[in-house]
A protein has these predicted regions:
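Mg2+-dependent phosphoryl-transfer enzymes with acidic/Ser/Thr/Gly-rich catalytic loops
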Residues: 1, 174, 181-279
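A short acidic/small-residue loop/turn micro-motif
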Residues: 22-24, 222
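Short, flexible loop segments at the rims of nucleotide/cofactor-binding pockets, characterized by
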Residues: 17-21, 44-46, 176
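Short, surface-exposed amphipathic charged segments that create phosphate/polyanion-binding patches used
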Residues: 78-86, 171-175, 262-265
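Active-site phosphate-binding/coordination module
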Residues: 24-119
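Asp-based phosphoryl-transfer active-site loop
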Residues: 2-20, 203, 211
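Conserved acidic, metal-coordinating active-site core of Asp-based
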Residues: 108-199, 204-213
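The start of beta-strands in P-loop NTPase/AAA+ ATPase cores
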Residues: 4-6, 65, 198
């Protein structure tokens, strides 16, 4: 069996925190899969470290080998229980901001009174996260921020979302090259993985850049309807949509991840079926 890299989103992909049911035994089979010595497991998530560790504890998730966190702005190597910040990734994305960091960019945006910095744990060297009142004209705000940053030759990606529960807007300011796809490619290159032994799994619009790339990917069966529509229109050859039925499971969450890995890696398909028969 050859070595393989499995990169997966967390919320509603590996973590069964959506409205769809989880197949009994699916997470146990996932743990068995990633415990193989040939497997390198990477979590790819918008969560920051504390929330990732909380999820690992709350949902009894396997400890990964790598974590791509904070919407692609941070990469960690995990050795035993030690999280090692991968400084080389910081150097990779730093040129987008001309070597400037969090506090420098924050100072550039000090003239926007509607921006309130989020808590310290939601910030990092290359990520500014703000709260924004919902009554704000968001398109104008984003346009004005982009104009301000371009005046300083800062190449940034602005990500807008809404915290429905708290009724507040959320705005992330990131280097333009800090994203899931670039981070996964960086990891593949540094660790010697190819398209022939890498699989990504996701469920939402935040995963589309990878799902629609040339990296083999699986969309779990519980994915958002809008995402399913987007990928259907794209008709990419390197995307597998979990259907359910593999090993009697429904294709949701970890069951869909397993189904997708088996689709791309025949040796894993054979191994999983043998393990299932042995039960």
């Amino acid at each position: 069996m050859k070595d393989f890299l499995l990169c997966t989103d967390l919320d509603r992909t590996l973590i069964p925190n959506g409205s769809h049911p989880l197949s009994p035994g699916a997470i146990e089979q996932f743990k068995q899969l990633v415990s193989l010595k040939e497997a390198t497991l990477t979590y790819v998530t918008g969560r920051h470290r504390a929330l990732i560790e909380q999820a690992i504890s709350n949902f009894d998730l396997p400890r990964p080998d790598f974590v791509i966190a904070d919407v692609g702005t941070t990469i960690y190597r995990i050795n035993a229980s030690e999280w090692q910040h991968w400084d080389e990734w910081d150097s990779e994305i730093a040129p987008d901001w001309r070597g400037l960091a969090h506090d420098d960019i924050s100072n550039l945006l000090k003239d926007f009174p509607v921006l309130s910095l989020q808590e310290a744990e939601k910030q990092n060297l290359h990520k500014l996260s703000f709260y924004v009142p919902l009554q704000t004209n968001v398109s104008r705000l984003i346009g004005d921020i982009n104009t301000k940053l371009k005046q300083s030759d800062i190449k940034a990606n602005l990500i807008w979302s809404i915290d429905e529960e708290a009724k507040i807007g959320l705005l992330d300011v990131l280097p333009i090259s800090a994203n899931k796809l670039h981070a996964i490619r960086f990891l593949m290159n540094k660790q010697g993985y190819t398209h022939g032994n890498t699989v990504f799994s996701g469920d939402s619009g935040n995963d589309l850049d990878v799902l629609l790339s040339d990296i083999p990917a699986v969309l779990v069966a519980n994915a958002d309807a809008e995402v399913r529509k987007s990928v259907a229109e794209a008709d990419t050859a390197t995307l597998y949509i979990a259907k359910g039925g593999f090993l009697g499971m429904n294709g949701n969450y970890s069951a869909g991840i397993i189904e997708g890995v088996a689709h791309y890696l025949p040796e894993i398909d054979t191994w999983l079926r043998e393990q299932n028969l042995a039960k």
